[in-house]
């Protein structure tokens, strides 16, 4: 599946690569490849309140909590559209620096302004989704979050500094696509195996 090249420890040349790709990965600020989304649900375009589950991604609050914890008036919430991302600064078991998830299940939804939302302006969306699912970006957040500074379970991560975080990514979109396709296929296989296990129980 891949060949092996030396790593300099800076994520510039991952040790595991698909054949045919040997260019060093490039450091980019989040702001280089994504724009912040701050549009409000001012006209109540959606009445679907969203929340982020570290395991399941962006989901309907009602389905997730069996109730809505959002305000009845969601006109002040962010309006997030399908394919856009949101960062939940709340920590949970196994996710010490929160979660970044893409909206996949619905065409749009309303999200609390406690979240930091963004839309890609370049790069393969499935690859970026896989990258943020990998938690490789955690050390970037660690560097900008005040140690021990939490407010009601939320990390103290300023939005402007969040968009200044640097990420090593492949410039070649073909490599991005190959990585994304591999991870998608692997996830589907894991889901299928889990389904078999659940049916046996």
Predicted regions and their residues:
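A short glycine-rich beta-alpha junction/loop motif
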Residues: 10-14, 108-114, 146-174
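Short coil/turn segments at secondary-structure boundaries
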Residues: 43-51, 144
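Non-catalytic DNA-recognition/assembly elements of restriction-modification systems
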Residues: 13-41
